[in-house]
Curated annotation (Swiss-Prot):
One GO location term (cellular component): plasma membrane
Protein name stated in the entry: Xanthine-guanine phosphoribosyltransferase
Membrane topology: Peripheral membrane protein
GO molecular function: guanine phosphoribosyltransferase activity; hypoxanthine phosphoribosyltransferase activity; magnesium ion binding; xanthine phosphoribosyltransferase activity
GO biological process, one term: XMP salvage
Record organism: Rhodopseudomonas palustris (strain ATCC BAA-98 / CGA009)
Keywords of this entry: Cell inner membrane, Cell membrane, Glycosyltransferase, Magnesium, Membrane, Metal-binding, Purine salvage, Transferase
Binding positions (guanine): D111, I154
Known pathway: Purine metabolism; GMP biosynthesis via salvage pathway; GMP from guanine: step 1/1; Purine metabolism; XMP biosynthesis via salvage pathway; XMP from xanthine: step 1/1
């Protein structure tokens, strides 16, 4: 039996479960900060993780134009090479003058910064916001709400279900 390389989740080590209520509160807190920095012409969600926070932020800021940039970097819980599956539409890019000025990029998490760098290169003047930030990715975002350590794995509510959790004393992480 060959030993496989540990996944990002296993290497991260520190679980950080986030409930729907907590995520919604954090997205509203992000919206409060962003409201002072606008106005913005459109929201661009980095999919898939940025879809839910983008919807909440767009509602809170009264933005009707919502676009996506689709970049794949994780396959389940293992990070791989980045792939642009869909870029920002020409219509949205035009709203930002081609450089992103007045556009708001939203993601759930900035981790290593690889995805952020790629999107930043597409729209260098856009405002980049994330709900959560890790130290390696933090310099790439303009606004975030909560910083977690680099060795933390965030369990987002759309990736989890209700189940029994053993007590910490029994070896639960």
């Amino acid at each position: 039996m060959t030993q496989s390389e540990p996944t990002e989740q296993k290497r991260a080590g520190r679980p950080f479960p986030v409930s729907w209520d907590q995520f919604h509160r954090d997205c509203r807190a992000l919206s409060w900060r962003l409201n002072e920095l606008g106005p913005f012409h459109a929201v661009i969600a980095i999919t898939r993780g940025g879809l839910v926070p983008a919807a909440i932020v767009a509602r809170e800021l009264g933005l009707r134009v919502i676009d996506t940039v689709c970049i794949a970097s994780y396959e389940h819980d293992k990070q791989g090479e980045l792939q642009v599956l869909k870029g920002v539409s020409d219509q949205t890019a035009t709203l930002g003058g081609g450089t992103g000025k007045g556009l708001l990029i939203i993601d759930d998490l900035v981790d290593t910064g690889k995805t952020g760098r790629m999107v930043r290169s597409m729209l260098p003047d856009a405002h980049f916001a994330a709900v959560y930030a890790k130290p390696k990715g933090r310099p790439l975002v303009d606004t975030f709400i909560t910083e977690v350590s680099q060795d933390t794995w965030i369990f987002f509510p759309w990736d989890t279900g209700l189940s029994f959790q053993p007590p910490l004393k029994d070896g639960a992480g």
